[in-house]
Amino acid sequence: MITTQEISQIRQQVRAWHAKGETVAFVPTMGNLHLGHITLIKEAVKRADHVVASIFVNPMQFGQNEDLDAYPRTLAADQQALSDAGAELLFTPTPEIIYPKGMEQQSFVEVPNISEQLCGASRPGHFRGVATVVCKLFNIVQPDIALFGRKDFQQLLVIETMVADLSMPIEIIGVDTIREASGLAMSSRNGYLSQDQKDRAATLKRTMDTMSAAIQQGESIQDVIQAGHSQLSEAGFRPDYLEVRSTSDLSPASSEDSSLVILAAAYMGDTRLIDNLCFTR
């Protein structure tokens, strides 16, 4: 696997592959990789002739009260894991390469409506940072397909909407959430949890399972959400939000909506965890 910080080297290699009629898949990450990321790479290997990954801890998507410097950097281990999974090219730019004029002077991409609720309400500017860096990475790599985990359902919808609205010739593929045996969604943030906190954090998935079953049995969504809040609080969570929305646009679920998603964000100690569960009724 080739690792480079050079935009020109990425473009040269991808152009060479495309000139042969070969397809390119792209998996952007922030590093500190776990099995969920590796699953994305392995799925990409199945779907394209070549796989490009990136590792960039994007300062634009971190809020003022979020410690960018504390995010784990594990480049050597990440390189080995990506290579073993089948990635051929790894882009590891610095903030100065991605934002040469600084973030304040950087042109940006903002997806309205979807970006402003749920995680967007709790983390103002977060999805502007996500959309901007993903747009820039897409322009650098020029992939045919790009893969993202469904664990961050809102992020996936933001990216799908951006690609559609801006007519980008890229197929976006969502890959199912990878979970630990307890049901806890795999996340780089799980490393911040003690074993006791990890055990209690598994309640997040169980709560969503209970909620989806209750809604499918005809219970009121508001009553189900209220019960879910109680279940999370009893496990030691501090819920940020717990909502039931339409999968198409994240609008509040109406009686006509059949394709629904439960979206949750909650703090276990100082660690903010997110998860979601899609279901039909």
UniProtKB/Swiss-Prot annotation:
Localization annotation: Cytoplasm
InterPro entries in alphabetical order: Cyt_trans-like, Pantoate_ligase, Pantoate_ligase_C, Rossmann-like_a/b/a_fold
Highest taxon of the lineage: Bacteria
Binding site for ATP: 30-37, 149-152, 178, 186-189
Positions that bind beta-alanine: Q61
UniProt keywords, alphabetically: ATP-binding, Cytoplasm, Ligase, Nucleotide-binding, Pantothenate biosynthesis
Positions annotated to bind (R)-pantoate: Q61, Q155
A Pfam family: Pantoate_ligase
EC number(s) reported in the record: 6.3.2.1
Top EC class, one word: ligase
Positions of the catalytic residues: H37 (proton donor)
Pathway annotation: Cofactor biosynthesis; (R)-pantothenate biosynthesis; (R)-pantothenate from (R)-pantoate and beta-alanine: step 1/1
Catalytic activity: (R)-pantoate + beta-alanine + ATP = (R)-pantothenate + AMP + diphosphate + H(+)
Keyword field contains ATP-binding: yes
CC per GO annotation: cytosol
GO molecular function list: ATP binding; pantoate-beta-alanine ligase activity
HAMAP family: PanC
Described function: Catalyzes the condensation of pantoate with beta-alanine in an ATP-dependent reaction via a pantoyl-adenylate intermediate.
Stated family: Belongs to the pantothenate synthetase family.
This protein's name: Pantothenate synthetase
Species per Swiss-Prot/TrEMBL record: Shewanella sediminis (strain HAW-EB3)
Record lineage: Bacteria, Pseudomonadati, Pseudomonadota, Gammaproteobacteria, Alteromonadales
Gene, per the UniProt record: panC
